[in-house]
Structure formats: C-alpha cells, structure tokens
C-alpha cells in the first residue's frame, strides 16, 4: 500500500533515509510458552533497502500518522499482526537525520503470547527470536545501533 510517506528524505549531508515524513518500526515482545522473552523480527527481502538483514517490521510514516499508528499499520501489512492483540508500551526515537525533521521511532509493544504471522513480499522470513539471540543475527545497521538500549528498556506493565 503506497502512502504519501513513501519516498526518500535526505539529510543535509546527502544521506538518504526512507520515509518522507519519517519512519517507524514495531518492537513486539512476547513470551514463549517456556517463559523465554522473544521479539518479532523480519528478515528483509533481498531487493529492499538493506536487504538480507534482520530488523523490525516497519516503514515510512504517512503525513497524517503518529509513529504508533505507522508502526502498527506496517506490522499489519508486513506480518499480518492483529492490532487488537498488541499493547503499545512506549515510543522511542532511535535515529534522526542531520538538518531535517526526519526520525525513526521504535514503538515498543507487548503481546500476551507468540502471535501467528504471515509475511508479505517485503520479508524473506518472520521469526520470533529469543532476546538473547538477536545480536547474533546480521542486523540492519539502524536496528543494530539501537538494539541494546531498546532491550534494556524496562517499562511498566
């Protein structure tokens, strides 16, 4: 689905960032039946920007959306996640582009259990990954830069 946010934004140094109005991703956490904490990761399709890396379901924000709305919409599109099973806990700006208003916001959310997922064409795979195994994967550089601080967040609820 194309929205008015699809397209590149450019920093004052010429570096490009996806999302004309910024971008957002969903860090969805859920316990396995054995209690191990997991997060849902997307193995990005090879044709996509930074293809072949693991990251969060997410993408460009449209002009009328909050970061939370964009992250949940993208997770529905890319993973088939039901919005009514997701509880948003926080929104954290984890990247910005020099000289612009562009930001990437990670929306941290919880689900009571591992939810079934259905990948779209933007994913090679979707996987619930134990938190302690995330850093061992070939991560998208932006997600890699923020993972440890996101993992360390302790939120009420």
Predicted region positions:
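N-terminal leader/linker segments that precede catalytic domains of diphosphate-processing enzymes
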Residues: 1-53, 59-114, 155-157
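NUDIX/MutT-family hydrolases
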Residues: 106, 117-151
